[in-house]
Amino acid sequence: MGRIIIFTGKGGVGKTSIAAAHAVRAASEGKKTLLVSADMAPNLGDIFETEVGGNAVPAGDNLYLLELDPDQLVRENYPNISKAMRNLFGSSGLALDNLDDEMIIPGFENLFSLLKIRDIYNSGEYDLIIVDCAPTGETLSLLKLPELLSWYMEKFYPVGKTMVRVMAPVSKAKYKVTLPNRKAMNEIEQMHWSLVALQELLKDPDVSSVRLVCTPEKMVVDETKRSYMYLNLYHYQVHGDFINRILPDDAGSDFMNHWGSIQKKYIRELESVFAGIPITRIAWYPHEVRGRAAIQHLCDDVLGDKDILNVRVHTDNEIYEACDGGWSLTIRLPGAAKEDVTVYQHEMDVNIKVNNFNRCIPLPNTLTGAQIDGWDVADGFLRIQFSKKADGQDETAEAGKDGK
């Protein structure tokens, strides 16, 4: 079985260099490795000092590089969706001839990069796929899309498909608006099932894992902690944290030693947050990581004899348990504060909102008729209590900021 390792972190922390070092190590061990960039501003070519494009290119024995172009993937794999969207907006009086597809659904095009990675994995061509993702904010938005879109497809697509078929003639004749045709709707349905498979793949702890990259400074550490919390919210496995650009103990001047003491404070904070997760410290090099020799040096220095590629720290992000008078659902939310969390229920779905991120979890059939009785956030876990619903009670229950 192949593996997928996703590297992400705040922009400028060195995630591409560290992903490249892992790819070089894996290739040297005889694993056929693909290092793929899912960033809209890729720089694999800059680091390896070679031309990289939309097709995999060799970069040494067992090592291949690929920079994905989402617009090209949409045109090649879902031409009818793209055409339908242009017809829909064009018939509404908007001139789209000079606009890229990404302007139609902002941010949505990045999803096709993940779908392409799934296709590459399913081909079995590579032993290991290392993904250099966009900065954490974009990556989190991207990783939550498969689950979010799958939920909407399951809830609303059957009705929407029927309405489009019925309304298409009227819409075109009376309002001059061209709705998606049957081919486009079939592609949307095909994409839905691809999203379901993608979600299962990315959340399979035996296949996929996420590695976070950061530097020991306040803004980066705060974002890394939030990313770790949100990744747990969406049930992704985080198997490592790489702390980059660490100053030596004696940096040679009072100014640098002062910054070194600040870094140590944030390193201790990260070690507390990522307890149980492997943490790798990386020195601040006097030169930029560029070219195969520099990547190899980083690989030898950082990875050494460690078997980092096979690290698997499986955690149960969602645990259902029977308890007195009902059931409980426990979800890992490391670093979450109760005031940042809202939980409410609609029918057989539980919605969890943490700051600006929202996740909808369909409840198992065992909890049919149950409703939220209360919830709490403590010690890095969200615990939701369910009890049997009284007859005639409203099926929509909300637990507000106080958890009641």
Give the location of each predicted region.
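Beta-rich strand-turn-strand
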Residues: 339, 368-391
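C-terminal lobe/tail of nucleotide-utilizing enzymes
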Residues: 195-338, 349-351, 356-358, 362, ...
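Nucleotide-state-sensitive switch-loop elements of NTP-binding domains
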Residues: 1-13, 17-196
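Short loop/turn motifs at secondary-structure junctions
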Residues: 1-3, 125, 237, 371, ...
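Generic beta-strand structural signal
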Residues: 322-324, 345-346, 376-377
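Structured core elements
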Residues: 6-8, 34-35, 64-67, 129-130, ...
